[in-house]
Amino acid sequence: MRSPWCLVTKASLHVFILLACFVFAPALWGQELNVYFKTTPRLELLRPFADPADLALLITDADGRPVDNATVNVRLDAPTPGGFFSTDMPIVEGTRLNEMTLKLRQGRVSWKYLFPIRGEYKLVVDVRAADGRQAARTFVFKIRENESKWLALGAFSVALFVLGFGAGRVFTRTRAQAALVVLALSIGISARGMTAPSPQANSVGKLEVEPATVGKLSRIAWRLENAGQPDPRTVLLTLTVTHLEKGKIVFAVEKLPIAGEFATQFQFPDGAEYRVTAAANIADLGPVHGEQVISVAGIEPPARAAAPALFYFIGLIAAGLGVGRWSKIRAAPPERR
């Protein structure tokens, strides 16, 4: 027979464990960090190389309060190849587009980015708080192609089929034994040589941009100096990358608090000229500006990227030829076939 003291002891132990769970559970739950991602405009409205989007991250505790003293490492990867038709920038497919570390301000951080191609992007976010808490989230989202491009492709496809149809009827009228149609599509992409400008510096701010090549990350860095030495004071930095030919902002951070320096790994998506500007507001010195114009080295896309489209267009013309020839023979009297 069990002792009453044994039963009381076990019951007390169960009550103690239950109370401990209620007391310490909030503390354990408080260790969690929530990561939220938002774009403006909404993802459904974004299109490749149309307008830059505002990308924002919000980091909160489990109770919804913003986390102030923390940094986030952000990595953005381009869509992988896989569609029948390649994108406008096949070299960019499956590569890393951007990587940087940002400091939270009231639990938030935001930046501008112009998505270069259609497809499924992957954004990896690693959060590290000052008290040691960490969180990692991966956001996968899709950017749709411009509707006007699909309409243009459809119209061009119809035009090729009609061209083949007309050619089939013309060649059949001459009663030739065979008709050979050759479609030669040559796409020449001239890679512009990259000229690496020497870093420009003023009395306190220094902007540096590594030589840029399509398909590879280039380091963009800005740091504050005092008499040639690093100055760790906190400033608000605005960094902007602009596509000069299209006049569009492809990347920007605005009034980002930094401790004397900032760096990002950024891929310039095409072989064109870009302007990189940096502006910082310093308490006792006022605004500081820096600017560089760089030429990005383009790379000729592999033949396999254009092969599906080439075969598709040739197939349309061949189908039109066959249908045109068949319709002409079908309409002719039996003695003239």
Where are these regions (language model features)?
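Selective for proline/serine-rich intrinsically disordered segments
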Residues: M1-W5, F24, T39, T195
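Bacterial N-terminal signal peptides that target proteins for export
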Residues: S3-F16
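Bacterial N-terminal signal peptides
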Residues: L13-A25, A184-S186
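N-terminal soluble domains immediately following signal/targeting peptides that reside
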Residues: W29-V182, G188-R336
